[in-house]
Amino acid sequence: MNRRRAYEDDGDFYGERNKKRRRVSENQEMEERLETLILRVGENSTSSLESNLEGLVSVLESDLGNFRSKILRILSDCPIKMPEKCTIYSTMVGLMNAKNYNFGGEFVEYMVKTFKDSLKQCQWDAARYALRFLADLVNCHVISTNSLLQLLDSMVDAANEDNVPQVRRDWYVFAVLSTLPWVGRELYEKKESALENLLVRIEVFLNKRTKKHHNALRVWSVDAPHPQEEYLDCLWAQIRKLRQDNWTEKHIPRPYLAFDSVLCEALQHNIPVIHPPPHQDSFEYPMPWVVYRMFDYTDCPPGPILPGAHSIERFLIEEHLHSIIEMHRWERKDCAIHLLMLPYKDKIPLEYCIVEVIFAELFHMPTPRYLEICYGSILIELCKQQPSKMPQVLAQATEILFMRIDSMNTSCFDRFVNWFSYHLSNFQFRWSWDDWDSCLLLENEHPRPKFIQEVLLKCLRFSYHDRFKEMMPEGYAKLIPKPPVPHYKYSMEGAASLPGTATAHKLVVAIRQKCNAEDVLNELNDLPNSRDASDTDMAEAPFNPLKIDVFVQTLLNLGSKSFSHSFAAISKFHAVFKALAETEEAQICILHNMFELWVDHQQMMVVIVDKLLKVQIVECSAVATWVFSKEMVGEFTKMYLWEILHLTIKKMNQHVTKLSREMNEAKEKLARTVESSSSESEDEAASPNAQKRRKNTEGSGEKPTEEQVERMEEKLEAAYVDQKRLFLIIFQRFIMILSEHLVKCDTDGRDYDTDWYRWTIGRLQQVFMMHHEQVQKYSSTLESLLFTSDLDPHILDVFHQFTALRA
């Protein structure tokens, strides 16, 4: 057989196939080119924006026949993913609508579908940006004012529904108000009475609205020098100011004004009637927030004036900066460059606006949007990008924060400490400490000296102790941390009189000679049990505190060289830990001995507790009980102790989430298995290869049985019980110590509002805020068991503020 001949005969076939490949490749290249052109319109260019828009519209119009769906999709995605370019894309759509009315109608339908889908999928930012874009299309004569007003009215109707969460109602009003800066002037000129009616309805809603959540979200407990306004109240004040100015603002670029003569001739489309999807229990809405203010015009140097707190320009600038952070947060250098290149940067004190917005994100309650280190790294990059201005503005901001720290929220205090210590570590720990020496006259529990002490403790994690002794002024000696060394009591003066010293020394020799877990237990067996002398609950808590004391202190001291040495020691003698820590009381004893050894090394305690939890030597409930134990009273206002408690809660939350995910995946696999089995049994007679196909598909993954799924459900249920118990322990201990303090102060006739009280009530609030998603599940249980009506109002109010967040 002539192989060459066969290939020659097939030449036409292969040639045709290659042509098809080339066509597909050409189409793909063209689509990518169109996408790039649309995405980059309005960016740096030698020609004007108007000429770029005209040229791009001509290109898109000529390609509509081949790439219609692609163009529709890109044009509807862009204003949502790049909201700062909203008016550029609305102008583009307006010009295309003027040339091709049918395309304009298709686009409006597509955009309305995008808006409705965003609402159904609880993509609230996307929905708000889609609404804004639809509103801006009114300015470009694509959509009629009547149909937009009808849509805005239906949004306000949704805000007035009964028996729905307030956070849902709030969002619908916020979406309408935040759209008005773009379209307010057009509505004012053409439908003034309808616009006024809309605003009256919103005002009535706002006047009836409760704001129990407000205090929980404040950065400071006082309003001087800047009021801390709830977000809807602030935006409403800004909209009212905009109305007073006849809806004229100076920030939004409006390229469509250059094409007014073309756009005004275009036919308009009507938005179909849109009914917002009804509330469902599975829907999660954005939580309320407080608008953060750090600067006003008096803080800025001569030059461009900072817009007032109630000017709409302040809202627009801040939203633009927040949007840049959201878009570029993964690349700190790009983020810093884009922040510094904000349009209209010459008309505002840009550095002050940027710093205020970044701290607003960092101090956002209940938790920041992104990791705290994200904001710290962006601020460092800003200082590098603009060394002549940014470091000075940041130093001024730090000074303002320090001077107002007395009334700062406890969670924000922690974040301020974390940020400042991280920032100092990147700038050789240089700071003008002498400017703050007035705080040395205050009590150690006062927030100012406490802040400096906590900052130095955090800085110690980035450096070494001797450096701080040399660096800090002499007056700060009492705030400098002690050297982070272990205190091994069996090698201290007077250790010979301790009952476990001889065994401890033997244990040191044995461990250094590479003994195993069984050898260690044999060494410990000779130690007497002080609990044998009494019959107190021996059946319930059969553990020997002296064994734990000798073993834990000796082992951790031998592993004290580094974190890795400590981890290796814990891993090697894991079996000994498990044998000694069979009860919660024994686990608390382990933690107490770790604390005795490492009392001056907070970071070591944090990582060791984390390790003990990870390898399941101690339970989460034991850590919580230890944190609130009498032995830890002296540590109660120190940050590291709450770092330990929060990592413990997070460990429990992650465990529950993991089990829940695994169970849901197993249920889905089981359901698919049952479904495929039934369909295969039906097809088996018709298809002789069905059994073979089934064997092939069965090998693709392990399928759970019903018994396995039931066991997983039981494990998840047990995890939920443990999680609920953990929160009950924590909140019960808070209530006990706070109630005791309040009663004692009342009895003694003293003011209850001490530094200790403010730290403790702040920590209670912090637990609610940091873990709000998990605590929310048990709010009814907490209300019925702990936060009852007879509780002191000061404590109860914290709980009510928390429940109001999602009310």
UniProtKB/Swiss-Prot annotation:
Residues 696-710 have a biased composition (Basic and acidic residues). The keyword Nucleus applies. This is Nuclear cap-binding protein subunit 1. Residues 669-710 are annotated as: Disordered. Residues 31-243 form the MIF4G domain. GO terms for cellular component: nuclear cap binding complex; nucleus. Keywords: mRNA capping, mRNA processing, mRNA splicing, Nucleus, RNA-mediated gene silencing. Belongs to the NCBP1 family. The gene is Cbp80. GO terms for biological process: 7-methylguanosine mRNA capping; mRNA export from nucleus; nuclear-transcribed mRNA catabolic process, nonsense-mediated decay; regulatory ncRNA-mediated gene silencing; RNA splicing. It is found in: Nucleus. Pfam families: MIF4G, MIF4G_like, MIF4G_like_2. It comes from the Eukaryota. Component of the cap-binding complex (CBC), which binds cotranscriptionally to the 5'-cap of pre-mRNAs and is involved in various processes such as pre-mRNA splicing and RNA-mediated gene silencing (RNAi). The CBC complex is involved in miRNA-mediated RNA interference and is required for primary microRNAs (miRNAs) processing. Also involved in innate immunity via the short interfering RNAs (siRNAs) processing machinery by restricting the viral RNA production. Component of the nuclear cap-binding complex (CBC), a heterodimer composed of Cbp80 and Cbp20 that interacts with m7GpppG-capped RNA. InterPro entries: ARM-type_fold, CBP80, MIF4G-like_typ-1, MIF4G-like_typ-2, MIF4G-like_typ-3. GO terms for molecular function: mRNA binding; RNA cap binding. Gene3D superfamilies: 1.25.40.180. SUPFAM superfamilies: ARM repeat.
